[in-house]
């Protein structure tokens, strides 16, 4: 994904109100309950969609937007798997749609735990493979979806992997293939919460593609339908939440 493509995503997001509204629901979920005047790191900030929303909704937060690609709208260019911050710097680490692009996602989780203050949280929204979403991601999405990935190194290309190659199966592999002892050793208080959520509104919005099948006036009812419909078979996204213990044992 080049800087030009990030600019294109910014343009579409600014012009496509229904898409920004859908993302706004996810952004608000990640912001909910963050401590007043907290210091927050956004990892994988990419086209810089989250930070303007966060700074408008929660102006009390000290926000740092980080991405691998240097861009004027983000604060720092660095690899989320090797974070350039001291231990216990942030009250929260958040992000949307970036974990499934990482060549060594468990390295990121370790780094996130390291830079979190005691009691801090990692929160993210990522693609999720379910019986409903698998064929959509596998056959209709440019990134695809692979079952049975190695959660430590989901991309076999290793160092030859392009920075923004992705696979929707990564998050499911992490949720099902990483034992609790690994999370404890990484610095969290146990296995993260992986809460599947529907994303019919996003699906009907057609994402960053041209047009939308979801009129904006139907967005509210569709989001409520998303929240009320059973998710076990239909979820397309997952909300991840991991907490660092209040103190080391």
Task: Go through each PLM region and give its residues.
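A short glycine-rich, Lys/Arg-flanked "PGG" loop and its adjoining helix->strand segment in the class I
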Residues: 106-121
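Conserved alpha-helix/loop element of class I SAM-dependent methyltransferases that forms part
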Residues: 18-37, 49, 53
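Conserved class I S-adenosyl-L-methionine
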Residues: 122-156
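A short acidic, Gly/Pro-enriched loop at the edge of an enzyme's catalytic core
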Residues: 81-93
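Class I SAM-dependent methyltransferase Rossmann-like catalytic core
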Residues: 1-24
């Amino acid at each position: 994904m080049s800087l030009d493509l990030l600019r294109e995503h910014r343009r579409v997001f600014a012009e496509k109100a229904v898409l920004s509204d859908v993302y706004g629901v996810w952004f608000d979920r990640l912001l909910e309950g963050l401590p007043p005047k907290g210091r927050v790191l956004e990892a994988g900030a990419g086209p810089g969609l989250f930070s303007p929303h966060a700074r408008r909704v929660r102006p009390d937060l000290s926000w740092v937007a980080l991405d691998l690609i240097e861009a004027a709208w983000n604060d720092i260019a660095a690899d989320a798997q090797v974070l350039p911050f001291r231990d216990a710097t942030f009250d929260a680490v958040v992000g949307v749609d970036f974990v499934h692009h990482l060549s060594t996602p468990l390295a990121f989780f370790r780094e996130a735990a390291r830079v979190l203050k005691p009691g801090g949280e990692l929160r993210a929204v990522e693609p999720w493979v379910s019986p409903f979403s698998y064929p959509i991601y596998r056959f209709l999405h440019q990134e695809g979806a692979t079952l049975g990935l190695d959660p430590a190194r989901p991309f076999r290309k290793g160092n030859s992997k392009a920075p923004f190659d992705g696979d929707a199966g990564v998050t499911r592999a992490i949720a099902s293939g990483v034992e609790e002892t690994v999370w404890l050793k990484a610095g969290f208080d146990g296995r993260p919460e992986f809460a599947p959520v529907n994303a019919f509104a996003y699906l009907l919005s057609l994402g960053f593609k041209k047009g939308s099948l979801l009129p904006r006036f139907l967005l509210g009812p569709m989001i409520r339908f998303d929240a009320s419909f059973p998710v076990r078979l239909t979820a397309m996204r997952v909300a991840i939440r991991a907490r660092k213990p209040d103190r080391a044992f």
